[in-house]
Swiss-Prot record:
Protein known as: Hemoglobin subunit beta
Similarity-based family: Belongs to the globin family.
Gene source species: Hapalemur griseus (Gray gentle lemur)
Keyword rRNA processing recorded: no
GO molecular function: haptoglobin binding; heme binding; hemoglobin alpha binding; metal ion binding; organic acid binding; oxygen binding; oxygen carrier activity; peroxidase activity
GO CC field: blood microparticle; haptoglobin-hemoglobin complex; hemoglobin complex
Annotated residues for binding of heme b: 63, 92
Tissues expressing the protein: Red blood cells.
Amino acid sequence: TFLTPEENGHVTSLWGKVDVEKVGGEALGRLLVVYPWTQRFFESFGDLSTPSAIMGNPKVKAHGKKVLSAFSEGLHHLDNLKGTFAQLSELHCDKLHVDPQNFTLLGNVLVIVLAEHFGNAFSPPVQAAFQKVVTGVANALAHKYH
């Protein structure tokens, strides 16, 4: 794995306390608010007209949970992220035509949401470990792009 044993401990310890539904919905919602051009992939989700509409949108929350559940699964396979995310990479590349840069943006937003939720427990070493993970996941998701 690309994490040191200490970093792996930080990630495992904190992730056990993460509310996947809440954090996932918030992270995807923030992505759509902060980077409005990402909304074009979610036009079927209904009202995305204001930040409060986005953050309260049940479809955004549900998809955010789905995204973070997949991320959570990836944490069990840090030694094979490309294999773990191969199908999702293909889907987002070939079918949805998502700009792979969006995976990096979402990873960075996730780090911000975790910092907000965990405060002082999200120390610089913990942040550094999570930054490595979200970068690894973003790279794995971008893997199928030509």
